[in-house]
Amino acid sequence: MILASVLKAFQGLQTGLQHSYQDGSPSCPINLPLSCGNETAISDLCCFEYPGGILLMTQFWNYAPSKPNLNRTELEEELGPVDSFTIHGLWPDDCMGGYPQFCKRDLFIDDVDYLLKSDAFNNDDTLPIQGEELLNNLNKYWKSNNGNHESLWIHEYNKHGTCLSTLQPQCYSRWNPTTSQKGPKYYKKKAVYDYFRISYDLFQKLNTYEMLAKHNITPSNDTSYTKSEILSALSSEFQGTQAHINCNSQNALTEVWYYHQLNGSILNEDFIPLDPLRSMSRCKDQGIKYYPKGYQRRDNRGPNKKPISRGTIRISQYGGFLIKTGRWMKRGTPANFELIESKYGNYLLKSRMGYCTVHNDKSQLDCSSRSPDYATQFDYNEEKGILGYSGSFEWGAESAPKNGRTSRSVVFAVSNEKNSNLKYKFQLKFNRK
């Protein structure tokens, strides 16, 4: 169990003891364990975050502009303030390091700007921050690498925000008795407002630029740093807990992730620092660059983006390949797949039948979606050439296909909590052409 020695103090559930909050805040048992700290199931998912009980505040350091010779105003409009990291997202990971994604289609949004400008979230003294002020903060500190910042916000909420159990509309009806007449439509919008408000609040508390500067780690065209120097500086400002850093192919710092457990509902904003569950980082031990915003390579290009790759997908251990529907066969012709770098990280996978998805209910692989908007984002380990999903690179099937050309087996993603008992376990090897 995570932090078992600490979490013993939180074990047990005594529902008679309640917090007393003002209207609009959760009223939950005071002695619930931290998220991912329970030893028995907890049914009240308005008070206990599950399955995404590990909350990551992820931040970008985007330094390369789209074109040279931008002035400071133009540079900050594109990349954010020169003396600040920007927000990538607030992600709920499961307790073993995997992560759910695009959980509830009925909660998906296609707009943030209009929602935060609406009367429902302005001119209301009971709100911690007015919607238009929050929107201004997002425009300043939550930047997309493609220039369409709102598209990143929408993506982050649909992919991650809809997976937060304590932000579901049915929870709001419990915490807001005086506004219960507003109903599910209002609560759906309130969850969007709260997701971005809480993300921004946590980002402000974790000022990575200042944390590094306190330890004389500042952006430079020439100076380089060791991984231990950067991690030590962050740890000393993050309650002695480690952060996770990532670099691009030039070994330049690009991201910092902060892991947390959650005490109660996310609406309480009681985040407890946690050491990273993932250790894989592209940053080398030595020679890490921390370039100032506006820096460009001598050939005037920003960091390389991987081109679209084309190839087949082979099954490790048992032999065979994937066909265009995403099923496993042993005889015949393997399908061609495209591995496409997503706008916001990770990869899309596409056959001529359509984009591949992993259905959340059974984690079954299917490649027939016509739209890329909500296609699954896959992990790709370039060194090993294997495909993964939600932090796991293991796949499986209940049965193996026979040698006939019509025999096909359904493929499932495997995680510590799903499909771990499948008879056949393997990896999906992407063979580039």
From Swiss-Prot:
GO biological process, one term: apoptotic process
One Pfam short name: RNaseT2L_C
GO molecular function: ribonuclease T2 activity; RNA binding
Family to which this protein belongs: Belongs to the RNase T2 family.
GO CC terms in record: cytosol; extracellular region; fungal-type vacuole; vacuolar lumen
Gene designation: RNY1
Record's keyword annotation contains Glycoprotein: yes
Protein name: Ribonuclease T2-like
Positions bearing carbohydrate: 38, 71, 221, 263
Cell compartments where the protein resides: Vacuole lumen; Cytoplasm
Native source species: Candida glabrata (strain ATCC 2001 / BCRC 20586 / JCM 3761 / NBRC 0622 / NRRL Y-65 / CBS 138)
Active site: 88, 156, 160
Residue ranges of coiled coil: none
Lineage: Eukaryota, Fungi, Dikarya, Ascomycota, Saccharomycotina
Role of this protein: Rnase which modulates cell survival under stress conditions. Released from the vacuole to the cytoplasm during stress to promote tRNA and rRNA cleavage and to activate separately a downstream pathway that promotes cell death. Involved in cell size, vacuolar morphology and growth at high temperatures and high salt concentration.
Superkingdom field: Eukaryota
PROSITE patterns reported for this sequence: RNASE_T2_1, RNASE_T2_2
InterPro entries recorded: Ribonuclease_T2_eukaryotic, RNase_T2-like, RNase_T2-like_sf, RNase_T2_His_AS_1, RNase_T2_His_AS_2
Disulfide-bond pairs as recorded: 28-47, 36-95, 46-171, 103-163, 247-283
Catalytic activity: a ribonucleotidyl-ribonucleotide-RNA + H2O = a 3'-end 3'-phospho-ribonucleotide-RNA + a 5'-end dephospho-ribonucleoside-RNA + H(+)
SUPFAM superfamilies hit by this protein: Ribonuclease Rh-like (SSF55895)
